[in-house]
Amino acid sequence: MAAAAAGPASSQRFFQSFPDALIDGDPQAALEELTKALEQNPDDAQYYCQRAYCHILLGKYCDGIADVKKSLELNPNNSTALLRKGICEYYEKDYASALETFAEGQKLDGTDTNFDIWIKRCQEIQNGSEPEVSASQRTQSKIKYDWYQTESHVIITLMIKNVQKNDVRVDFSEKELSAVVKIPSGEDCSLKLRLLHPIIPEQSTFKVLSTKIEIKMKKPEAVRWEKLEGQGDVPAPKQFTADVKNMYPSSSHYTRNWDKLVGEIKEEEKNEKLEGDAALNKLFQQIYSDGSDEVKRAMNKSFMESGGTVLSTNWSDVGKRKVEINPPDDMEWKQY
């Protein structure tokens, strides 16, 4: 990975941390670009560590272990590589090795609370108490949600931010909905609903956004749901009549103006004040998220080939040439 030998420390951190934003957006594309980058720089410890992160997001934990081992051979003091190695070992059910790896990483970086979380999970499993099946934790891990309906769909919104699509599982059946979401801390949150009326599972979908998860369940006919869940006797369905004011029922048992709520969330995100690295990361994540496939390819290729010193959205330019290393004027690029 490239680093600046002189100049602001924030720029150095930016060069080292920005690839994770690209990986989160499209782990498969990032995996391909990192593989190309490693063909040119086979001794780059950071590239191996970043590619291991791609494997984790794609669920390829054995490949992830191979990459972090190579990364640690090149740079034994990389706590991030140890964290990713431990996560891969955990999901491969090698809990003893995972615990040892997390403990080693914690010695290198005692400020990273991720090590505490994963060490606790390993210890609970080794002691014979699986945290994910604990009744008390199931209660604590229920997902908060709201719902509303249109003539054709029932829409459920899960109030969870900043999760990846690979960490979300939603299953539809005619009278039941279940969802499991792995949040950034590693904890599984779940939702299971016995629906008041049938839905069409094959035409029901979900979408993962930065601020929420939206689930759309297709109605077989245009009837109004008086509530979301139901068991036993079901009240006779009423013909759907569109509500002019968009006032919808919610799991909180009171009426809510959903359009107003969505507007408030968007306004809050728009006005959120970020500084330094956080502001840069948010800007580039937004460009990547909203960009076309060509824009994403251009950003991946330019960043990887230039060692983190160039970021281009112009595929017609960078697609036909190798992007050269071009650090800022007050910095010197070095390989480590």
From Swiss-Prot:
Chain positions with Phosphothreonine modification: T255
Keyword Acetylation: yes
GO cellular component, one term: nucleus
TPR repeats mapped onto the chain: 11-44, 45-78, 79-112
Assembly description: Probably associates with SCF (SKP1-CUL1-F-box protein) complex through interaction with SKP1. Interacts with S100A6. Interacts with HSP90.
Cross-link Glycyl lysine isopeptide (Lys-Gly) (interchain with G-Cter in SUMO1): residue positions: K266
GO biological process, one term: skeletal muscle satellite cell proliferation
Molecular function per GO: lncRNA binding; protein-folding chaperone binding
Modification Phosphoserine occurs at: S252, S302
Major subcellular location class: cytoplasm
Key words of the record: Acetylation, Cytoplasm, Isopeptide bond, Nucleus, Phosphoprotein, Repeat, TPR repeat, Ubl conjugation, Ubl conjugation pathway
Protein name stated in the entry: Protein SGT1 homolog
Similarity-based family: Belongs to the SGT1 family.
Domain (SGS): residue spans on this chain: 247-336
SMART domains reported for this sequence: TPR (SM00028)
Superkingdom per UniProt: Eukaryota
